[in-house]
Structure formats: structure tokens, C-alpha cells
Swiss-Prot record:
Keyword rRNA-binding attached: yes
SUPFAM superfamilies: L21p-like
GO biological process: translation
Pfam families: Ribosomal_L21p (PF00829)
Record has Ribonucleoprotein as a keyword: yes
Matching HAMAP family: Ribosomal_bL21
Family in the record: Belongs to the bacterial ribosomal protein bL21 family.
Protein name in UniProt: Large ribosomal subunit protein bL21
Subunit structure as annotated in this protein's UniProt entry: Part of the 50S ribosomal subunit. Contacts protein L20.
Keywords: Ribonucleoprotein, Ribosomal protein, RNA-binding, rRNA-binding
InterPro entries referenced in this protein's UniProt entry, alphabetically: bL21-like, bL21-like_sf, Ribosomal_bL21, Ribosomal_bL21_CS
A single Gene Ontology CC term: ribonucleoprotein complex
Amino acid sequence: MYAVIVTGGKQHKVTEGEFLKVEKLDIATGEAIDFDRVLLVANGDDVKIGLPVVEGAKVTAEVVSHGRHDKVRIIKFRRRKHHMKRQGHRQWFTEIKITGIQA
């Protein structure tokens, strides 16, 4: 059984027991969270597609940890001017474990 959920402006295909890194959520480590925006639920040949969400479907998860991704390097360069600006960015994430899918 799997589902497609929306969180942080992105769509994620999830299965029960899976660990997933999503955009940072303001929830303490160890707490449970429910995702109500479920776009699709599939159990074998039984597929439910929402318009836009599946009514009554819910995905539950547990917050495992918070952290930051690897650094992304940004270089702004102006040709012929000997000008370079280097910058880096590390995006925050929340790691969750999917504990249940209810449809």
C-alpha cells in the first residue's frame, strides 16, 4: 500500500515504515503528525485518486529528527570584470517515519 501526500509544496510517494526527509516542520522530535492532503491511495489494484484530495484519507507519521542538508555552493560571476561572489546555502529538513496510511 502506498500514498501520495503534499507537504512543503512538494509531492511525496510514501509507504508504511519508510523514512522521509521533508521541508522543515515546527514539530518537536518524537511527536506524531497527520497529513490530510492525500492525493492518491493505492492498495494493489484498488486505486483511489482524489479531486484534488482523497476524502477521509490520512497518513500518520512520527518526527525522527531535524537537520540540514549538504551545502549547495553558489557562484555569481561577471565576465571580463574579475568579479566573483561565492555563497553557500544549507536547507533545513525534518526526517519523518511513516507509521500508517488510512483510506
